[in-house]
Amino acid sequence: MLQLCDSECDGLSSLMECGGAVNSPGDTLGQSPAHLAACGGQAFFLLWQLQTGVDVNQQDCFGEAPIHKAARSGSMECLSLLIASDARIDMCNKDGHTAEDVALSCGFLDCARYLATIKLTQDTFSRAQSSLHNLKETAAGVKRGQCCQSISHGKRRRSDGFV
């Protein structure tokens, strides 16, 4: 697989020399320049791609997004850039593996731990947002109930006590 990444990096420069579009599947495997940069651990080139509007979740013919390629190469820098650009860490390739699974199978334990921590943080944040939304709905219902109790038969009380 490393030979594949090396040949992809060689193809990266020729792809860009030809003026390939940022999201175009530039090679026969359907890999964009971002896939190639992530696979080669080329964080600066990947950053440039991200700034030009690359689709960080575009999948190649293997179902792999750039985050899978970065995990396969063990590039913490590329993983960080992709996550900061809202790459989906729960996306599976055609074999059903997430980027965390790929990093683990390639022996990049730090990358796998990093991805697991990000996933846990995102899950916790999502649950907290959901709980906050439910709490706001409950509070709004209580306010509506209190408002209705202060009105007697659809009329407001006068300050002198008469209805």
Swiss-Prot record:
It holds the Pfam family Ank_2. It is found in: Nucleus; Cytoplasm. Gene3D superfamilies: Ankyrin repeat-containing domain (1.25.40.20). A motif (Nuclear localization signal) lies at residues 129-149. Keywords: ANK repeat, Cytoplasm, Nucleus, Repeat. GO terms for cellular component: cytoplasm; nucleus. Its main location: nucleus. ANK repeats lie at residues 29-58, 62-91, 95-124. InterPro entries: Ank_Repeat/CDKN_Inhibitor, Ankyrin_rpt, Ankyrin_rpt-contain_sf. PANTHER family: ANK_REP_REGION DOMAIN-CONTAINING PROTEIN (PTHR24201), ANKYRIN REPEAT DOMAIN-CONTAINING PROTEIN 37 (PTHR24201:SF0). This is Ankyrin repeat domain-containing protein 37.
